[in-house]
């Protein structure tokens, strides 16, 4: 190989040496073996940078998958909150008549008699005192440091009440760790109820040009945007409406539970939390954690979702609440359920009231009984299966000289599941369908939803349309399979023809850039869709890059291979029959081979990617052509 390199690099190498080696068959065989060895070595070296690139891509893809899994976990919590919203809407819509209330009172009395007398007698005075003392002492030492537990002076009770209100609303159906960052961000923007009262639910500044559908990007991040990611957006709407109601009133912030329940969005639980924590009123609070603690304290195995059972839990909590420190006691009861008296793994050995816990006592007496048997677990109905096709509609408009396309979002109805949130155009299907059926359903929806006055193909030119993939989205009672397609269109005329029937005051759609998507109040299912498109683009870019590098590398190797074969053929042919052509041709061929060999080796040594090199060469040729030099 050293000899071969000297031929390529040393122009003074004697021609006689080449001629003598050309006449020796052993030299030909040795040369062939060395070329084969070099080809194998260079091919392995050439693929090393690409393998390194692919390894980095795989590592990056794994990190993206982990981030997606975390987003899915948060999305599941959000969907639970959204389902709770739907249930709350139904409960709110059902108004009880006087006759039903009387019947419930009679049933409640019968239930109390079945439990062994008045509900107030279930806890003895001694038990009540021990539970209060044990919980408060434990809470003073072990309470978590949460931003909404800051103490306020007497003159700042209203601000304290506002902080409790915001935190309790956010904590509904949402983990504490998730709420903390949202709470801090919320309080920085609206530190008092009067600041919140001046906000708007969604203040969209729409261009008054011909193209109402395209926003300028200066949308204000108001309540829904600040709430984005928490889910259950009905809570944000009620917070805003309640704040406006309080600010508009003349009596200030209500300081009693009965008055607080008259404020929009404040129910019995939230009213009890605000009144006891901020205004020191001796009223109970009952949530899922409190129900679990009370059910185990008294070994109540009844269904906690039953209305009569829920009423009994409220009476138990009212009996236990400490009149001197009602706020701290209510928080200690909730803290115990959240940290020690958990659903599946209670820490009874660390519990401050285990000696008063009936469920723990029964589990010690009988090993077949477990503390986790209380309260009774409600059997959930199996989720139904449905199917949804989503169209990521990307619109380009050359008239506005946009750097990129914008995505069409449709606003959901103000009532019902996911009320008022934004999503990509989508259609729910009754059964699983093939690609053609799904595409036809999307076409029909686009024409109807956007009130096209012309056919879709006449209003715009379809640049591309392809399926991006599918995923499964889990609701509490629905298992939805979502099919995603990307439709890229180029407007052929003014956008006033595309969305002519849409008025600004009834805005149900808008077009936003990809940067704005993350700031909007989107459903968790919608947030799963964009990664499909991003992965699709990355995959195409990577494939093109790798393909170009592979082609250039393979071509260079093929040139080396064919040149070496031609040279060996000429030399072997001259041994059998003296070559009568141009006696310099074989030397030129050998020189060409080593020029290519030297070029390829230099690129590998310098770490030059053949894809980048090809782009540079193409750019150079294009420049020369434009200058008239080629």
Swiss-Prot record:
The lineage of its organism: Eukaryota, Viridiplantae, Streptophyta, Embryophyta, Tracheophyta. PANTHER family: ADENINE DNA GLYCOSYLASE. One of its GO terms (molecular function) is metal ion binding. Keywords: 4Fe-4S, DNA damage, DNA repair, Glycosidase, Hydrolase, Iron, Iron-sulfur, Metal-binding, Nucleus. GO terms for biological process: base-excision repair. The gene is MYH. It comes from Arabidopsis thaliana (Mouse-ear cress). Its EC number is 3.2.2.31. Residues 73-123 have a biased composition (Acidic residues). This is Adenine DNA glycosylase.
């Amino acid at each position: 190989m050293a000899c071969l390199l000297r031929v390529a690099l040393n122009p003074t190498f004697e021609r006689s040496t080449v001629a003598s080696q050309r006449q020796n068959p052993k030299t030909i065989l040795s040369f062939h073996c060395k070329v084969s060895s070099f080809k194998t070595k260079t091919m392995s070296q050439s693929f090393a940078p690409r393998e390194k690139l692919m390894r980095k891509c795989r590592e990056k893809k794994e990190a993206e998958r982990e981030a997606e899994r975390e987003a899915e976990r948060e999305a599941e919590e959000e969907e639970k909150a959204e389902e709770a919203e739907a249930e709350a809407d139904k409960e709110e819509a059902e108004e009880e008549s006087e006759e039903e209330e009387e019947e419930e009172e009679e049933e409640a009395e019968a239930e109390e008699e079945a439990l062994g007398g008045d509900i107030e007698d279930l806890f003895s005075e001694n038990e009540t005192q021990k539970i209060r003392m044990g919980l408060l002492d434990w809470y003073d030492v072990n309470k978590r440091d949460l931003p909404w537990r800051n103490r306020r002076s007497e003159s700042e009770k209203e601000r304290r009440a506002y902080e409790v209100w915001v935190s309790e609303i956010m904590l509904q159906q949402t983990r504490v760790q998730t709420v903390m960052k949202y709470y801090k961000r919320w309080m920085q923007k609206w530190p008092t109820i009067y600041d919140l009262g001046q906000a708007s639910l969604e203040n969209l500044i729409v261009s008054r040009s011909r193209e109402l559908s395209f926003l300028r990007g200066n949308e204000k991040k108001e309540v829904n945007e600040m709430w984005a990611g928490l889910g259950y957006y009905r809570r944000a709407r009620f917070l805003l409406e309640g704040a406006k109601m309080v600010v508009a009133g003349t009596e200030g912030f209500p300081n009693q539970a009965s008055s607080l329940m008259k404020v929009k969005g404040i129910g019995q639980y939230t009213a009890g939390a605000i009144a006891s924590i901020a205004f020191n009123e001796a009223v109970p609070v009952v949530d899922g954690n409190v129900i679990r603690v009370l059910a185990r304290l008294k070994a109540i195995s009844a269904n906690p979702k039953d209305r009569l059972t829920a009423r009994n839990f409220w009476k138990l909590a009212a009996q236990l609440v400490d009149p001197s420190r009602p706020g701290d006691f209510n928080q200690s009861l909730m803290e115990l359920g959240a940290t020690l008296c958990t659903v599946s793994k209670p820490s009874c050995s660390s519990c401050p009231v285990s000696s008063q816990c009936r469920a723990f006592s029964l589990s010690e007496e009988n090993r077949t009984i477990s503390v986790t048997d209380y309260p009774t677990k409600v059997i959930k109905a199996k989720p139904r299966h449905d199917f949804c096709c989503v169209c990521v509609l990307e619109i380009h408009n050359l008239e506005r000289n946009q750097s990129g396309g914008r995505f069409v979002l449709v606003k959901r109805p103000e009532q019902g599941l996911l009320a008022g949130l934004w999503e990509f155009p989508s259609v729910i299907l009754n059964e699983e369908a093939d690609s053609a059926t799904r595409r036809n359903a999307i076409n029909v929806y686009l024409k109807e939803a956007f009130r096209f006055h012309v056919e879709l193909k006449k209003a715009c030119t379809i640049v591309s349309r392809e399926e991006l993939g599918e995923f499964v989205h889990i609701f509490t009672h629905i298992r939805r399979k979502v099919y995603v397609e990307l439709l890229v269109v180029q407007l052929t005329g003014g956008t006033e023809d595309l969305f002519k029937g849409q008025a600004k005051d009834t805005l149900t759609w808008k077009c936003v850039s990809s940067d704005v998507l993350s700031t909007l109040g989107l459903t968790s299912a919608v947030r799963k869709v964009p990664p499909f498109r991003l992965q699709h683009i990355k995959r195409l870019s990577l494939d093109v890059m790798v393909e170009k590098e592979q082609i250039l590398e393979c071509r260079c190797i093929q040139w080396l291979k064919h040149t070496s074969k031609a040279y060996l053929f000429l030399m072997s042919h001259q041994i059998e029959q003296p070559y009568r052509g141009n006696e310099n041709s074989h030397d030129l061929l050998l020189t060409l081979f080593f020029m290519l060999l030297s070029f390829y080796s230099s690129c590998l040594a310098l770490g030059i990617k053949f894809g980048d090199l090809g782009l540079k060469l193409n750019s150079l040729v294009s420049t020369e052509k434009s200058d008239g030099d080629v």
